[in-house]
Regions:
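Catalytic Walker B motif of ABC-type/P-loop ATPase nucleotide-binding domains
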Residues: 158-162
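Conserved ABC ATPase signature
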Residues: 133-137, 141
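Helix-to-loop junction immediately C-terminal to a conserved catalytic motif
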Residues: 50
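The feature captures the beta-strand-to-loop junction immediately N-terminal to the Walker
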Residues: 35-37
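Conserved ABC ATPase "signature" region
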Residues: 100, 111-129, 177-180
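Conserved catalytic motifs of ABC-family nucleotide-binding domains
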Residues: 154
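Conserved ABC transporter NBD signature motif
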Residues: 58-65, 78, 116
């Protein structure tokens, strides 16, 4: 089942085409990477997908419905979650209060909201941080809280913008584990864009490589790593991909 389908997305700034007829799909329970060098067009493609940037051409379909012109909040109501690269937690609230603040917008009783908050705290290993103010969390703990908050509305697709940015290696491994669990245990589909190519490919079923505004290649990680054009254009010939063999 295809959840998200981007067809021939185009974006121009002035006389320059930064995204040139990019197409891709995200199926149910798939983790897809959107990768490319700085200035390649991947971030603009990602932002058109989530609704932050309006395309000059092409369409975005979600569950078969055309959402190309819908703002972000309406996409969220349809089941599309989003984790921003910038910190999005309420810094002066505790971890528990951050979850309850988002749960206030759901049609649940107080006891149901507390139960859901407790479940998310346990799922993301944040129970011991329950009373901790968000500003004092580590980068990895903050990322976990942000993902937990994104799950409050029970999205079927989650878009992660630089989830591994500013996070130490051990915390990155924790986040990778959470991403795998979102897919395997909760049935979520995930679209990731990140500059940490190695870590992103480790959790992806497939990835797209964007270059000069176009899809250079797409496929499973091992296939991309062994693609000579991808190595020449993006990964470099010294990129290690032994774990994908």
């Amino acid at each position: 089942m295809i959840l998200l389908k981007a067809e021939n997305l185009v974006k121009r700034y002035g006389g320059r085409t930064v995204v040139d007829h990019v197409s891709f799909e995200v199926g149910a329970r798939e983790v897809i990477g959107l990768l490319g060098r700085n200035g390649a067009g991947k971030t603009t493609t990602f932002r058109m997908t989530i609704g932050m940037v309006r395309p000059d051409g092409g369409t975005v379909l979600f569950n078969g419905a055309d959402i190309t012109r819908l703002p972000m909040y309406k996409r969220s109501r349809r089941g599309m979650g989003y984790l921003s690269q910038e910190p999005s937690v309420f810094l002066r609230l505790t971890v528990e209060q951050n979850l309850l603040a988002i749960l206030e917008y759901t049609r649940r009783s107080r006891s149901e909201r507390l139960t859901e908050a407790n479940k998310l705290l346990a799922q993301f290993g944040l129970e011991r941080n329950r009373r901790q103010k968000a500003y004092s969390l580590s980068g990895g703990e903050r990322r976990k809280l942000e993902i937990a908050r994104a799950l409050v509305t029970n999205p079927s697709l989650i878009l992660l913008d630089e989830p591994f940015s500013g996070v130490d290696p051990i915390a990155v491994e924790d986040l990778q584990r959470e991403i795998r669990q979102l897919r395997e245990q909760m049935g979520k589909a995930i679209l990731i864009t990140d500059h940490n190519v190695q870590r992103t490919l480790e959790v992806c079923d497939r990835a797209l490589i964007i270059s000069d505004g176009k899809v250079l290649a797409q496929g499973p990680p091992k296939e991309l790593i062994n693609n000579e054009l991808v190595r020449k254009t993006y990964l470099g010939h010294t990129f290690r991909g032994d774990e994908f063999d």
